From Swiss-Prot:
Annotated gene: pnp
Cofactor(s) in the UniProt record: Mg(2+)
UniProt source species: Wolbachia sp. subsp. Drosophila simulans (strain wRi)
Catalyzed reaction equations: RNA(n+1) + phosphate = RNA(n) + a ribonucleoside 5'-diphosphate
Role this protein plays: Involved in mRNA degradation. Catalyzes the phosphorolysis of single-stranded polyribonucleotides processively in the 3'- to 5'-direction.
Gene Ontology MF terms in the entry: 3'-5'-RNA exonuclease activity; magnesium ion binding; polyribonucleotide nucleotidyltransferase activity; RNA binding
Annotated ranges, domain S1 motif: 618-686
Protein name: Polyribonucleotide nucleotidyltransferase
UniProt similarity note: Belongs to the polyribonucleotide nucleotidyltransferase family.
NCBIfam families: polynuc_phos (TIGR03591), PRK11824.1 (NF008805)
């Protein structure tokens, strides 16, 4: 029934296998990739496009369902919802790797679906998913004429490169690099780097590329065994229209020389509309005209840049656009910056929060918490277009993650700066390189906020114009240069090294020479941008803003954690309510206090420390009235513990009733004078100066006060010895003033700070 074909090799100390012919047989291409114990099913289906379009409708989906990790989804419905950010990012990596390999003019609809079948939590699925996508395309019959592969590279503490590092190895790695390419060139790069030099990054790329070759050979052998040849594809022939476009060359050249984007766009649209109307009258097809005009513009601009050494806006190849930097532009935010580079502008705003504000991420490696979030927004008005507001798409998620990778290596340890940090980048104008403007703006905003980042970070996008063996590398590309060029190579980092890379190609790869020169030219541009940024702010503010939350932390004994939290959280809740602060207690005994002011934070700290201090005679505590009886007041400490006070200890003068002095929910300071046999504290209000919190010493009572059946002697001697028959023997009366030796506080240690809240 099944005609199974399987090929495998040993690669990076694990077995990599490709298999087809057993499952998903109705797809045009179906491959199961196993690497270690991670397994991915990749299917490819193509469909002829009924309408002419001028783009490749390629849809790549990576799907990781929870059963692959042996889990049941959370939530009410118990099934997967929208794709996670991790799934979206893996889908983008695969898309960016394979999209340049389809022939120009091929516009059939292609669907590539990568289903994660099993995940061993050791071997990340990115590599087998990309390998499976290439293998499935190779046997599907679509015109896909290049064979590539993907690889991950890490770097250990001894600067040794690691091929396809495990999840645990990657956690300790100073490099997280994913690249794809064929036998001779590099096609796509995605990386987070901990300030490594350009030389180290370049060597890592060469290391990874060398280990691609066995996999490329495996895919070719696998496809040859299947024997499905790619269908023939004839490119669109628009040569007759192209000849008629030559007379518009000067008009296009003049329009592209406009440095202001809006003026350039308007001039180009006017020329295109004129051409379309003119050629349609001759009977030419509108879609064919549009296709020819697009290619004509591309060839014209590329030739001008390559031969005349002048770019669209008149800059030199390595020249950076004008930069304007402002910080603290939004008065009531925790931090803000406005970064403008040419016609690209990013408003970046920060907000600080507590551990409770951390993002809970349901990742394929398991749930984790992120204390640093970076969200990138790209509204339609940024490019002068109209569009309804929508949820963030793949592009926004990808650009935000790239900026996150660029900033993450320079963030302080959480022990040094325990705030949760959210950064939002609002792109207000865009003419290329908005993700790198986000990187620059984020670095500025974090320093304005007072986040002690290790060094400022800047980013730059590099472009490429290549014709056979001739090429020109462009620094800080415009949107049109990205659209008409061959490469978009984003490099971010500090003055000491690289922190993030992202390279996308529109051609079938570039040489190592171009990669190396691009990194060198990017460094020069990055240092120039950092110089402009440092002229405005080069170090983080000494403290967070006055209106930002204040934080302090301290440690308590682990055996005190339960008391600090209290029964059902009563103690910590009470301290938070009374101090107007947020308090978080870790398993290691670390207590983090967040408040709107430093004073409130210190009050909360004092309350929390006092609430777990052991009660003893002589302690002064804060209490609240919870119940009043005829001669007894029931009091409550902040931690929920109860105590009692006799009417005789309410005031230093005779009172007829407790209600004449106290009422429900009153709070005051009281002295612990004794404990009942059951441990219930006996308290006194009259023995504490309510203004200073100090003990009263000496004569406290009016000698003429009237004793009655509920006098203080009865209270202090209410530990009766009961005889059979119910009679009681009363203890000898205590002195009418001062303390008995048994109840005398330890006045040598009567500092109110030793109290119990």
């Amino acid at each position: 029934m099944f005609k199974i074909i399987k090929k495998s090799i040993e690669w990076g100390g694990r077995t990599l296998s490709l298999e087809t012919g057993k499952i998903a047989r109705q797809a045009h291409g179906s491959v199961v990739v196993n690497y270690g114990d991670t397994s991915v099913l990749v299917t490819v289906v193509s469909k002829k496009k009924e309408e002419n379009v001028d783009f490749l409708p390629l849809n790549v989906q990576f799907i990781a369902k929870s059963y692959a990790m042996g889990k049941i989804p959370g939530g009410f419905f118990k099934r997967e919802g929208k794709p996670s950010d991790r799934e979206t990012l893996i889908s983008r990596v695969i898309d960016r790797s394979i999209r340049p390999l389809f022939p120009e003019g091929f516009h059939d609809e292609i669907s590539v679906v990568c289903n994660l079948l099993t995940y061993d939590t050791v071997n990340p699925p990115e590599v087998p998913a990309l390998i499976g996508a290439v293998a499935a395309l190779a046997i599907s019959g679509v015109p896909f004429h290049f064979t590539i592969a993907g690889v991950m590279v890490g770097c250990d503490e001894n600067n040794n490169y690691i091929l396809n590092p495990s999840v645990q190895e990657m956690k300790a790695s100073s490099l997280d690099l994913f690249l794809s390419g064929d036998e001779n060139s590099i096609l796509m790069v995605e990386s987070e780097v901990k300030e490594l030099s350009e030389e180290n990054v370049f060597n890592a790329i060469k290391f990874g590329h060398e280990h691609l070759k066995p996999v490329i050979k495996l895919i070719k052998e696998f496809a040859d065994t299947i024997g499905n040849k790619p269908e023939s594809f004839a490119p669109i022939d628009a040569s007759d229209i192209t000849q008629e476009l030559e007379k518009y060359g000067k008009d296009f050249e003049k329009a592209y020389s406009q440095t202001v984007k809006q003026e350039r766009v308007q001039a180009l649209e006017a020329i295109r509309e004129n051409i379309l109307n003119t050629l349609k009258e001759t009977g030419k097809d509108e879609k064919l005209i549009t296709y020819a005009v697009k290619n004509f513009e591309r060839s014209l601009v590329r030739e001008i840049i390559r031969k005349k050494s002048v770019r669209i806006d008149g800059r030199k190849h390595d020249e950076i656009r004008q930069i304007e930097v402002e910080v603290d532009i939004l008065s009531k935010t925790h931090g803000s910056a406005l970064f403008t580079r040419g016609n690209t502008q990013a408003l970046v705003v920060t907000a600080l929060g507590t551990t409770q504000d951390e993002q809970i991420v349901d990742d394929i490696e398991g749930d984790r918490r992120e204390h640093f979030m970076l969200h990138y927004n790209f509204p339609s008005f940024a490019v002068g277009e109209t569009s309804a507001a929508r949820a963030p798409g793949r592009r926004e998620i990808g650009h935000g993650k790239l900026a996150w990778k660029a900033i993450h290596p320079v963030l302080p340890d959480k022990s040094e700066f325990p705030y949760t940090i959210r950064v939002v980048s609002e792109i207000l104008e865009s003419d290329g390189s908005s993700s790198m403007a986000t990187v620059c703006g984020t670095s500025l905003a974090l320093m304005d906020t007072g986040v002690p980042i290790k060094a400022p970070v800047a980013g730059i996008a590099m472009g490429l114009i290549k014709d056979k063996d001739e090429y020109v590398i462009l620094s800080d590309i415009l949107g049109d240069e990205d659209y008409l060029g061959d490469m978009d190579f984003k490099v971010a980092g500090t003055s000491e090294g690289v922190t993030a890379l992202q390279m996308d190609m529109k051609i079938s790869g570039i040489s190592f020479e171009i990669v190396e020169k691009s990194l060198e030219q990017a460094k020069a541009g990055r240092l120039h941008i950092l110089e402009k940024m440092n002229a405005v702010i080069s170090e983080h503010s000494d403290d967070v803003k006055d209106h930002a939350p204040r934080m302090l932390s301290f440690y308590i004994d682990k055996d005190k954690i339960s008391a600090a939290i209290g029964s059902k959280g009563k103690n910590i809740r009470s301290v938070c309510e009374r101090s107007n602060a947020k308090i978080e207690i870790g398993d290691d005994g670390k207590v983090s206090v967040f408040a709107t002011s430093g004073t409130e934070a210190e009050i909360a700290k004092s309350m929390m420390i006092d609430s777990i201090t052991e009660l003893e005679q002589g302690s002064i505590v804060d209490v609240k009235v919870v119940r009043i009886e005829k001669s007894i007041v029931e009091l409550e400490f902040l931690n929920g513990r109860k105590g009692k006070m006799h009417i005789s200890e309410v005031a230093n003068e005779h009172i007829d009733s407790i209600e004449s002095v106290l009422k429900q929910d009153d709070t005051f300071k009281a002295l612990v004078i004794d404990f009942e046999k059951g441990g219930c504290p006996k308290l006194s209000r009259r023995r504490v100066d309510q203004e200073t919190g100090e003990f009263f010493e000496g004569e406290l009572y009016n000698e003429e006060r009237k004793d009655g059946p509920n006098d203080r002697d009865n209270y202090y001697n209410n530990s009766f010895s009961r005889k059979p028959g119910g009679s009681h023997h009363k203890r000898p009366p205590r002195p009418r003033s001062g303390f008995s030796n048994r109840n005398r506080p330890k006045f040598g240690n009567n500092d109110s700070s030793s109290g119990f809240y």
